[in-house]
UniProtKB/Swiss-Prot annotation:
Functional summary from the UniProt entry: Catalyzes the dehydration of D-mannonate.
Enzyme class: lyase
Residue ranges that the Swiss-Prot or TrEMBL entry lists as coiled coil: none
UniProt protein name: Mannonate dehydratase
Stated family: Belongs to the mannonate dehydratase family.
Length: 396
């Protein structure tokens, strides 16, 4: 809890850390001014129980430098749960046990997502900006080229317009073999925090698991999952926060069910338990111009227990890249203002983190996790901290 003038609640500033193998150290994070860590036990296979022993080992490591493990991101939802096949009931029981153990260890916010197969999707992990820094980018023509001519997904050609297919073929013909292989790696090799990586054949096999599962059916599976685990979360004092789809549109024929305000509302209506909460990610949701981020912050404020601040710059072709945190299409001032007012109304400091950052300055010479280099996020956190404080000083 953060107080200013004894009454004002400011956000808890957190930072995503990928564990002991992360090139950004806990001491780096402490020097950036963050106080909370967003972390997961990536070494534990999807579906297995997070034991108290493993949780405490990581928690004590974080606390050894004076930081706090504030948020879990994420306890992965096994694909069998999403498809309701195989051992999905056992995996749900394991998930419940992990929630109990996290609550017992004093960790009370757990992020998850219900995106099939892919966590988040970009075609370029090192897009060079005019200032020389590098960002993550989604190029629609390259994405469609991957789908049609590299993956060769059955039925894919029916999902795109003739104009899109023509642009994709032209784009594909411009690629040399090295660029094609890089595109494949970017699409399916798995990003930081992704627990699975695939060959093209394995990847298609994973996509095939979702044949016959449309958005309505996937939503039914999500609601079933939440109805099974929310009572456990309530008892453990754990808030579940679902991360929205990234990007918020259909990918490779896979259904998307957490892309807009209507999706959020449907989930809350179906599972009203207090533990059923939201992670508001301005970067993911902001890719769609139809999403009113300030309005969503106000409408769903009682359910928002974690915030990712990120901005994207989109164009009319369906492309976007990750912009600086205070630039791009997200009106960060008004979103932050709504966030600050939300915290005053609820009288609570809500964890937020700078979501992604440009690879810049010294980090350009280093091997970094895409989107998770140190200096770009340090800049983002400083800008967001200053914006929040400036708004707070001016209106409270």
């Amino acid at each position: 809890m953060t107080l200013l003038k004894d009454k004002l609640f400011l956000s808890e500033q957190t930072w995503r850390w990928y564990g002991p193998d992360d090139p950004v150290s806990l001491w780096d994070i402490k020097q950036a001014g963050a106080t909370g860590i967003v972390n997961a036990l990536h070494h534990i296979p999807n579906g297995e129980v997070w034991t108290v022993e493993e949780i405490m080992k990581r928690k004590e490591l974080i606390e050894s430098v004076g930081l706090k493990w504030s948020v879990v991101e994420s306890v992965p939802v096994h694909e069998h749960i999403k498809t309701q096949t195989g051992n999905f009931r056992k995996y749900i029981e394991n998930y419940k046990e992990s929630l109990r153990n996290l609550g017992q260890c004093g960790i009370h916010i757990v992020t998850y997502n219900f995106m099939p197969v892919l966590d988040w999707t970009r075609t370029d992990l090192a897009y060079t900006l005019p200032d020389g820094s590098k960002a993550l980018r989604f190029e629609r023509a390259a994405f469609i080229a991957f789908d049609l001519f590299l993956l060769k997904r059955p039925g894919a050609e029916t999902e795109y317009t003739d104009e899109e297919k023509t642009k994709a073929r032209i784009r594909f013909e411009q690629m040399d073999e090295k660029e094609k292989q890089l595109l494949v790696r970017n699409m399916i090799a798995g990003l930081p925090g992704s627990e699975e990586s695939f060959t093209l054949e394995q990847f298609q096999h994973e996509l095939d698991r979702y044949r016959g599962i449309d958005a309505e059916k996937l939503r039914t599976h999500l609601i079933y999952f939440l109805k099974e685990i929310t009572s456990t979360a309530d008892e453990a004092g754990v808030k579940l926060v679902i991360h929205p789809d990234d990007p918020p549109c259909s990918i490779l024929g896979l259904p998307r069910i957490m892309s807009c305000a209507e999706d959020f509302q449907a989930l809350i209506d179906a599972v009203p338990n207090e533990s059923n909460g939201l992670c508001l990610c301005t970067g993911s949701l902001g890719v769609s111009c139809a999403n009113d981020l300030e309005g969503m912050m106000r409408r769903f404020g009682d359910r928002i227990n974690f915030v990712h601040f990120r901005s994207t710059q989109r164009d009319a072709e369906g492309n976007f890249y990750e912009a600086n945190h205070l630039e791009g299409d997200v009106d960060m001032y008004h979103v932050m203002k709504a966030f600050l007012e939300l915290q005053q109304r609820r009288k609570v400091s809500i964890p937020m983190r700078p979501d992604h950052g440009h690879q810049m300055v010294d980090d350009l010479k280093k091997k970094t996790n895409p989107g998770y280099s140190c200096i770009g996020r340090l800049r983002g956190l400083a800008e967001l901290r200053g914006l929040e404080m400036g708004i707070a000083k001016s209106i409270f």
